[in-house]
């Protein structure tokens, strides 16, 4: 039996910045990456770093219509975040790794099919791009997404609303209580 290996990909997108005190900031990932590095986890033979490449236009356009134009919307940071997921999924499906963890930003679950710009700090729906990649490249059909975030993954839900082969579960704050 092959030993379990975990694929790890990291895209901090330090150029994707809101106000200095905004919670969705590069510091969130930089701090986490620093803790992972200090802990020695990266030295374990069971960890494999997976290099991210920007998601290609075909992968993005399998999900999104970018207005006013593709390059104005699909900039490097969101393309790298989506591409990291694609690389990690390819590594898993090829058997190179057993599972994976993607430490990426910007987030994506608020982005709808038609993308006019940032919506809830999301430009491209990373997970929707991944789903279409899995279907097109790897011929996977039935897929489940479990979105755990303080906010509802409304963009992902909207994209897959009429898809009978996709189960979408969003566990989020209801507004009357603390998360969840």
Predicted regions: what is each one?
Residues 1-180:
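HDAC/HDAC-like amidohydrolase catalytic core signature
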């Amino acid at each position: 039996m092959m030993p379990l290996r975990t694929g790890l990909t990291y895209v901090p997108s330090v150029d994707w910045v809101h106000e200095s005190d905004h919670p969705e900031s590069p510091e969130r990932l930089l701090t986490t990456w620093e803790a992972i590095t200090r802990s020695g986890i990266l030295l374990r033979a069971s960890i494999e770093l997976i290099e991210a490449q920007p998601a290609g236009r075909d992968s993005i356009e399998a999900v999104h219509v970018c207005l006013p134009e593709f390059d104005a919307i699909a900039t490097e940071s969101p393309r790298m975040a989506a591409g990291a997921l694609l690389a990690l999924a390819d590594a898993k499906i090829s058997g190179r790794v057993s599972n994976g963890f993607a430490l990426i930003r910007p987030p994506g679950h608020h982005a709808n099919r038609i993308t006019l710009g940032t919506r809830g700090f999301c430009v491209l729906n990373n997970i929707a791009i991944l789903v279409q990649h899995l279907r097109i490249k790897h011929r996977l059909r039935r897929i489940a997404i479990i979105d755990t975030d303080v906010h509802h993954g409304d963009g992902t839900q909207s994209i897959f609303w009429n898809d009978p082969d996709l189960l979408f579960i969003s566990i989020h704050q209801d507004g009357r209580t603390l998360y969840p």
